[in-house]
Amino acid sequence: MDQQAIYAELNLPTDSGPESSSPSSLPRDVCQGSPWHQFALKLSCAGIILLVLVVTGLSVSVTSLIQKSSIEKCSVDIQQSRNKTTERPGLLNCPIYWQQLREKCLLFSHTVNPWNNSLADCSTKESSLLLIRDKDELIHTQNLIRDKAILFWIGLNFSLSEKNWKWINGSFLNSNDLEIRGDAKENSCISISQTSVYSEYCSTEIRWICQKELTPVRNKVYPDS
């Protein structure tokens, strides 16, 4: 008997095992986030940076103001200290050859001149002919005159237009201040001696008295340490 080959086609399911294909990639928005999320994140970062800059700027400004205030305070303290050392009221002092009388310095001339020339000489010394305010000042001035026979011009003459005795500062004589011996007339000027007050012709050559204010001498007084 002829053996007949029998062929059978086996259609066995092939087991390909696990899928060899690469896993599908994750969605892009899982890693990178949505556009709104990215915008919010950037905005937050920008806000934080801006806040840091503002805080830093404020800190610098405050520090600068504090330093400026400290410097100004130190400057004020130094100036006040200088004022204490140089600007405290000091003694009052007259120039050499001048004599002190109250708050005035007086210079008694040793030469003679007419009244107008005497007035000009005092002006060159940054002073004026003597102005006497009251009887008490007159007496104190006369006490400084050593010789009874010597006369001295003062800053008082007769104003013909106003028919009155007028001081060189523009004020008029109070009749109670000086008891004048002599006439009140044109070209009359006043002189004083150790004992009296006289009206003389302004052209008469006699001595004169200049006056100036006392000069303050600033003493250095150092502040307590």
From Swiss-Prot:
N-glycosylated. Contains sialic acid residues. GO terms for cellular component: cell surface; plasma membrane. Residues 1-45 are cytoplasmic. InterPro entries: C-type_lectin-like (IPR001304), C-type_lectin-like/link_sf (IPR016186), CTDL_fold (IPR016187), KLR_subfamily_B (IPR051527), NKR-like_CTLD (IPR033992). Residues 101-211 form the C-type lectin domain. Induction: By IL12/interleukin-12 in NK cells. It comes from the Eukaryota. Glycans are attached at residue 157. SMART domains: CLECT. It is a single-pass type II membrane protein. One of its GO terms (molecular function) is signaling receptor activity. Residues 67-225 are extracellular. Expressed in a subset of NK cells predominantly in intestinal epithelium and liver. Detected in peripheral blood T-cells and preferentially in adult T-cells with a memory antigenic phenotype. The keyword Phosphoprotein does not apply. The chain crosses the membrane at residues 46-66. Keywords: Disulfide bond, Glycoprotein, Lectin, Membrane, Receptor, Signal-anchor, Transmembrane, Transmembrane helix. It is found in: Membrane. Disulfide bonds join 94-105, 122-210, 189-202. Pfam families: Lectin_C. The keyword Glycoprotein applies. GO terms for biological process: cell surface receptor signaling pathway; regulation of natural killer cell mediated cytotoxicity. PANTHER family: KILLER CELL LECTIN-LIKE RECEPTOR SUBFAMILY B MEMBER 1 (PTHR46784:SF1). Homodimer; disulfide-linked. Interacts with acid sphingomyelinase/SMPD1. Plays an inhibitory role on natural killer (NK) cells cytotoxicity. Activation results in specific acid sphingomyelinase/SMPD1 stimulation with subsequent marked elevation of intracellular ceramide. Activation also leads to AKT1/PKB and RPS6KA1/RSK1 kinases stimulation as well as markedly enhanced T-cell proliferation induced by anti-CD3. Acts as a lectin that binds to the terminal carbohydrate Gal-alpha(1,3)Gal epitope as well as to the N-acetyllactosamine epitope. This is Killer cell lectin-like receptor subfamily B member 1. It comes from Homo sapiens (Human). The gene is KLRB1.
